[in-house]
A protein has these predicted regions:
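Active-site proximal beta-strand in glycosyltransferases
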Residues: 48-50, 64-82, 99-102, 119-120
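Conserved donor-binding/catalytic core segment of Leloir-type glycosyltransferases
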Residues: 136-154, 159-166, 174-177
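A conserved, positively charged/aromatic
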Residues: 84-98
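Conserved donor-binding loops in enzymes that form glycosidic bonds
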Residues: 8-10, 79, 124, 146-152, ...
Length: 203
């Protein structure tokens, strides 16, 4: 099957949506399909469209549906589709979709009942590296990794600020990986690192 994965164009090379689309493409190819990732629908011939982010890929979804009304379309609702609220545009995309993917069970609670029969939960997976235990000795810290670009909609410093309230004997350290997409976070990250010994921004 020829599968087209449509992901939003992003200001950063490796957005969460792009990473998800690339990973799904690999998994689909491993299952014997021909899968490709694009940021625009430009008339590509495909048997199935998977559109990541119902709002940002709606134009491509509508164009594919118009060109191939008999071919299935799946909409994957990603983070900012759902939070803080589902937009009218995303709801229109759900109307067009034959199936809807969400990435965690709690997301189902945010989707109107009329679309419930379309929804499937696909829990994200990752290839784990070989264990590094013992290579550098035992750590004195319990490390929490936050992965996400810094922009307001994601509340990216929430974990760091929560870590400030931990008891002094706690061994928790917060390491944050993600690009700065809103410039004010450059100053806020520096300030957080200066006052919070538990927090480190990795870039």
């Amino acid at each position: 099957m020829r599968i087209l994965l449509l992901t939003p164009n992003s200001r950063v090379n490796r957005s969460g949506n792009r990473n998800t689309a690339e990973r799904w493409a690999v998994l689909l190819c491993e299952l014997g399909h021909d899968a490709e990732v694009r940021t625009r629908y430009e008339g590509q011939d495909a048997d199935l469209l998977i559109a990541l982010h119902g709002e940002k890929t709606q134009e491509g979804l509508m164009a594919f549906r118009s060109a191939h009304p008999d071919r299935p379309c799946i909409v994957a609702l990603t983070g900012t589709d759902l939070y803080p609220l589902i937009s009218a545009t995303s709801l229109e995309s759900l109307e067009l979709a034959d199936g809807v993917i969400v990435l965690q069970k709690k997301a189902i609670e945010l989707i109107p009942d009329e679309f419930a029969d379309k929804v499937t939960v696909v829990v994200q997976s990752v290839n784990l590296p070989q264990s590094r235990q013992g290579q550098n000795g035992a750590s004195d810290h319990f490390e929490v990794c936050v992965v996400g670009h810094l922009r307001e909609v994601k509340s990216p410093l929430l974990t760091a600020r929560a870590a400030r309230d931990l008891p002094v004997e706690s061994s928790v350290r917060v390491r944050h990986a993600g690009g700065i997409l809103e410039e004010q976070y450059r100053e806020w990250v520096a300030a957080e690192e200066a006052i919070n010994p538990r927090y480190e921004w990795l870039g």
